[in-house]
């Protein structure tokens, strides 16, 4: 077949013939033949950091995506409470970054006496009504980082919502099926999933049954490492544990990301682990031939991540997730160490505009963040992922192409490379990730419309 354009290596070539046989690319050449397929042929998108399984589960619940003010959110919640048959009502996806204020326990108490939990899109913040707080205390006792007066929960409960309100086995399997269909529809054949133990077990079960369609490269949470020992040993084409996940800080939206300078509305966030705890996690990962996946958004967390990784004899096997607001020296340090970085350009588009959430919350620190051009110039080992906020690469590509700081924008070839080949390389994949003879034909076609 002759394609109008194709990403070959790091460059887009015109009029490219690609021959595929038995699932492998056999021949690639520039030709003068008539174009048969428009658009741009690219290697499969690789979403290096995602939460498609809990996201797919959340699609069975009322979602507040796109609701731009508090009143509309409360109206939506009140209307949808009536539609949820379960005793505990869980709603997902609110983004209060442009509201006059966030939700409170009292807001939710006025809507229903049934237990109600509403989780923010970042996953680091949730608001509960009195009934939900009561049922949690009865089942689990005191919940860490839950303010019973305001109903605000950060980090522990929202991040582990499925531990407190566990889905059924059928719901988990349905979430995996739904996630794969969604991924394929977006041209993603390889995903780096942050997966809790029940999802891991179900993925392995479904892989053994031969029903998985895409390649899952997953990180297990450190607090579940003992339960995951046997799963870590399991490996196939479509499933492999590649990392151990731990949080060093939280999110900007929840005001829990850790910064050396304070938020404009107060507080600095805090580090969640000591250096000694992180070194133990790193050594555990290395003993299992895995890398760490360290969530680090604020400069204090990034500084800690790099400081501890310096103690490793092989820092290049490890990853820092998000790496959003490093100080200038952190960019060079990460590049020099060869540390893998998974960045989310969709955050730039969603919250990174001048006057947006990041700018309002961080002031001048905003300008430290997501410096893609600097990373290119330093030849850093980085790739893109979505964190499923929202899912899919196209939204994020626009964040890289139309970065609010013009000097940090990427060109189309660079951005596509970071969402395809660079992602495969970060996972250590050699069989696919390029449009080249001998490579597995994991490919997709995109249009050329990348207007903001």
Positions of the model-derived regions?
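Divalent metal-binding segments
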Residues: 2, 6-21, 25-212, 216-226, ...
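Short, small/polar residue-rich loop motifs at catalytic or cofactor-binding pockets
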Residues: 11-14, 239-240, 428
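A cytosolic small-molecule/anion-sensing beta-strand core signal
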Residues: 21, 248, 439
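Short, glycine-/Ser/Thr-/acidic-enriched flexible segments
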Residues: 25, 96, 123, 133, ...
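Non-cysteine beta-strand/loop elements that form the S-adenosyl-L-methionine
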Residues: 51, 239-256, 339-349, 386
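Acidic (Asp/Glu)-rich catalytic clusters
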Residues: 207-210, 231-239, 286-287, 313, ...
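Phosphate/diphosphate-binding loops
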Residues: 214-245, 317-324, 359-376
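His/Asp/Glu-enriched, well-ordered alpha-helical/loop segment
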Residues: 284-293, 300-302, 306-318, 323, ...
């Amino acid at each position: 077949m002759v394609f109008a354009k194709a990403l070959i290596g790091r460059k887009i070539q015109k009029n490219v013939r690609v021959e595929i046989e038995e699932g492998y690319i056999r021949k690639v050449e520039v030709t003068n033949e008539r174009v048969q397929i428009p658009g741009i042929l690219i290697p499969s998108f690789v979403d290096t950091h995602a939460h498609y399984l809990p996201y797919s589960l959340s699609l069975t619940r009322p979602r507040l995506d796109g609701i731009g003010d508090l009143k509309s959110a409360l109206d939506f919640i009140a209307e949808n409470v009536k539609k949820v048959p379960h005793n505990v009502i869980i709603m997902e996806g609110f983004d209060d970054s442009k509201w006059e204020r966030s939700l409170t326990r009292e807001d939710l108490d006025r809507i229903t006496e049934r237990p109600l939990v509403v989780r923010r899109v970042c996953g680091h913040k949730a608001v509960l009504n009195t009934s939900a707080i009561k049922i949690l205390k009865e089942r689990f006792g005191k919940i860490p980082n839950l303010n019973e007066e305001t109903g605000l929960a950060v980090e522990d409960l929202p991040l582990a919502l499925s531990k407190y309100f566990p889905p059924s086995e059928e719901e988990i399997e349905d979430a995996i099926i739904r996630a794969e269909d969604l991924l394929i529809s977006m041209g993603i054949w390889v995903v780096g999933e942050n997966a809790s133990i029940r999802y891991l077990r179900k993925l392995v079960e479904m892989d053994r049954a031969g029903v998985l369609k895409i390649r899952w490269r997953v990180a297990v949470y450190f607090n579940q490492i003992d339960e995951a020992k046997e799963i870590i040993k399991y490996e196939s084409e479509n499933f492999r544990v590649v990392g151990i996940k731990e949080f060093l800080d939280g999110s900007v939206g929840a005001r829990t990301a850790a910064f050396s300078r304070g938020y404009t509305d107060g507080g600095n966030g805090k580090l969640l682990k000591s250096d000694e705890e992180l070194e133990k996690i790193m050594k555990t990962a290395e003993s299992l031939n895995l890398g760490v996946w360290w969530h680090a958004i604020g400069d204090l967390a990034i500084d800690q991540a790099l400081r501890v990784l310096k103690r490793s004899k092989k820092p290049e096997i490890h990853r820092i997730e998000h790496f959003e607001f490093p100080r200038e020296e952190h960019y060079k340090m990460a590049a020099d160490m060869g540390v893998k970085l998974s960045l989310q350009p969709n955050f730039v588009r969603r919250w990174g505009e001048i006057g947006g959430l990041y700018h309002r919350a961080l002031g001048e620190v905003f300008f430290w963040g997501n410096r893609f051009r600097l990373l290119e110039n330093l030849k850093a080992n980085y790739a893109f992922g979505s964190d499923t906020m929202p899912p899919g690469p196209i939204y994020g590509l626009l964040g890289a192409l139309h970065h609010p700081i013009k000097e940090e924008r990427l060109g189309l070839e660079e951005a596509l490379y970071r969402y395809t080949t660079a992602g495969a390389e970060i996972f250590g994949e050699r069989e696919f990730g390029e449009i080249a003879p001998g490579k597995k034909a994991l490919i997709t076609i995109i249009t050329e419309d990348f207007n903001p």
